[in-house]
């Protein structure tokens, strides 16, 4: 079965995915996305589509799991895709089950985002914040502190372009990478 699940991982050219990361199920990874070693992406209840320019750090867990009240053995629920937009950052040790996420969001270290939360764009979920409500988080919302207080920032967070460029250069020097899809044919020099 491990053979079958590995084949459904699609990595776009230009993405940097370390071999030490764990990716299971039907996962599509967009270009310029960087996935650190020990990051986990698990698609068990449906596919996960990750857009362009995302940064997924060590021990981050992105999981499309079955809701607590459904077990895959008893019922055959229709698979629901998890869609992640562009330029999102999943910091060290965060846990995300959000089924829909826009662009330019940051989930900070040890933060938890539940399955029924929809992140729009430009949101920051602060370190150690636990967000497990049925709601759509408005654009540019910052959730912070031990009490998960909220405020709206005037601008959305800057994309991590320089950090992505740096990691795309450095990670291949120290880690083996997973192969990308053969999208473009490059001539081989003899």
UniProtKB/Swiss-Prot annotation:
Membrane keyword on record: no
Subcellular locations according to the entry: Cytoplasm, Cytoskeleton; Chromosome, Centromere, Kinetochore
Transmembrane segments: none
Posttranslational mods: Phosphorylation at Thr-186 by CDK1 during mitotic prometaphase creates a binding site for PLK1 that facilitates its recruitment to kinetochores.
GO terms assigned for molecular function: dynein complex binding
GO cellular component: centrosome; cytosol; dynactin complex; kinetochore
Modified positions (Phosphothreonine) in chain numbering: 186
InterPro entries for this protein: DCTN6, Trimer_LpxA-like_sf
Tissues where this protein is expressed: Ubiquitous.
Functional note: Part of the dynactin complex that activates the molecular motor dynein for ultra-processive transport along microtubules.
Family membership noted in the UniProt record: Belongs to the dynactin subunits 5/6 family. Dynactin subunit 6 subfamily.
Protein name (Swiss-Prot/TrEMBL): Dynactin subunit 6
Species per Swiss-Prot/TrEMBL record: Homo sapiens
Classification of source organism: Eukaryota, Metazoa, Chordata, Craniata, Vertebrata
